[in-house]
Amino acid sequence: MPKLKTKSSAKKRFKVTASGRVMSAQSTKRHGMTKRSKRSLRTRRGIAQMSAPDARIVASFMPYSL
């Protein structure tokens, strides 16, 4: 059976930790930040853990991530 390919878009956007959690950057940080509150912008710094249903989908894009 041939090797499964990892989707390039997924490996650029997501990181899988050693414990199997899928991490991603916060959304809504591209443009239009002057409208948003400073608190909203602060909470979107760094990376966040994805929800379980979304993480399962992303994990299927990266078959050798675990």
From Swiss-Prot:
One GO MF term attached to the UniProt entry: structural constituent of ribosome
Alphabetical GO biological process terms: translation
Bias-annotated ranges (Basic residues): 1-15, 28-45
GO terms for cellular component: ribonucleoprotein complex; ribosome
Region (Disordered) residue spans: 1-49
The entry's keywords: Ribonucleoprotein, Ribosomal protein
Family, per entry: Belongs to the bacterial ribosomal protein bL35 family.
UniProt protein name: Large ribosomal subunit protein bL35
Organism: Anaplasma marginale (strain Florida)
Gene: rpmI
